[in-house]
């Protein structure tokens, strides 16, 4: 295993500069064009070299399942432009709306935009910075259009600590994938508490493929490969992180990695949502470890998709010092965020970590940011265009550190000094408080639902709470923003919508009673409909009649 420095460091030698510049004259433009073409060719050649060079892999960590072998696919889409609308091309030779994206980099201009080459909401919060939420319009007079299954409910039994409980519906985070298939079908994909991944026609709610069974419940959100490979990535409480093919007669497991591939110290669930950047999958597990895995996606001689994964980096998310402070509950339940060439994750011990992944293909990912927020972080780190971090923290342990910092925190991971920018308190008194939901970035305001029943709007510059709405207690679902409309699900089974024309004073538009049970899952907004599951055992499509 590559050596990883666990020491604390906030300093990055060079911060990316973002500034304007005067337009050159015509001759300068011609010279610039030539330079750009030459540099572009060099970048493409370099990208191909990187993808063809064998990575450094740990000697003592191997994937537990036998993967499918294949010729490697061409270099993924590092030099292509990211799609931003139906009209924009994904080809760097025809698109004039977005700059080229270097391989293994998530540029600042991808914040708030869709990710990848297919049309769809392919992962939790839509992109690697976790800042894109779907496509409008948002319904204006919503009704339940259909629910799934037609009868009964999606329920399963799961055992934790010797206690067996029946779980129904979809849970936290539980956001569905919605995507436009090449055959014209809009498909919704989600994992559920009946120990299955389900595939539905977004128009009718009827199954599009057989459900994929797992050995235990699925709490987290699934990921559809963003580069067009017919692969779905998901974890389960059955200890497995999987890659599932979607180009066979039925969804088929291509590869699985067991959580005990390392010596974890909490449990073996996979709640976090995998993120894929140029053939590298990043994921954290409840075994308390972070992984960077090269997928080696390709196709066999019959044209069927294959993977041949290899672990590039495996890093414990904890330190001995952290365990001495908070105990052994240091699992990574949140999803990984990626910005430029940094990967961020947070764990249940309150540790927020940033890794430099510029040499991840060589098996290197040194820690460049390390900060303790004092309590459990299950919500996902959100990164804005300037690389600032928004961290939503629970209030369970009642530590002095958490009381000092607050429960919604903004951090500057690039500063040489104290990275703490501001914090908003949300204590729970004698009970739990704080946030399980992941923040949604708006226009100068960040929005979030709290366990204590508050829907907040917070100024991103000052940390001032500029707006607050009372909602149901235990609201863990993450709010979403589409077409200047904020949509929030509550634990009272409601969907609420607010007009963000004035982001500091949202105007209530409607409240829809979707279910009589708690909605813990995060909704997906897609072309006039809202898709989300409930703890009542059902999954819903909501829209205008």
Task: List the model feature ranges, each with a label.
Residues 121:
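Short glycine/Trp-rich loop-beta-loop segment that forms part of the substrate-binding cleft
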Residues 64-97:
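Extracellular mucin-like PTS domains
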Residues 3, 11-13, 33-34, 55-56, ...:
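Detector for intrinsically disordered, low-structure N-terminal pre-sequences
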Residues 4, 15, 56-57, 69, ...:
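Intrinsically disordered, low-complexity segments enriched in proline/serine/threonine
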Residues 29-49:
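Secretory targeting and sorting signals
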Residues 1-28:
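Terminal targeting segments of Actinobacterial cell-envelope proteins
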Residues 95-116, 124, 131-172, 177-271, ...:
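Extracytoplasmic/lumenal domain signature
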Residues 42-66, 76:
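C-terminal region of N-terminal signal peptides and the immediate post-cleavage residues
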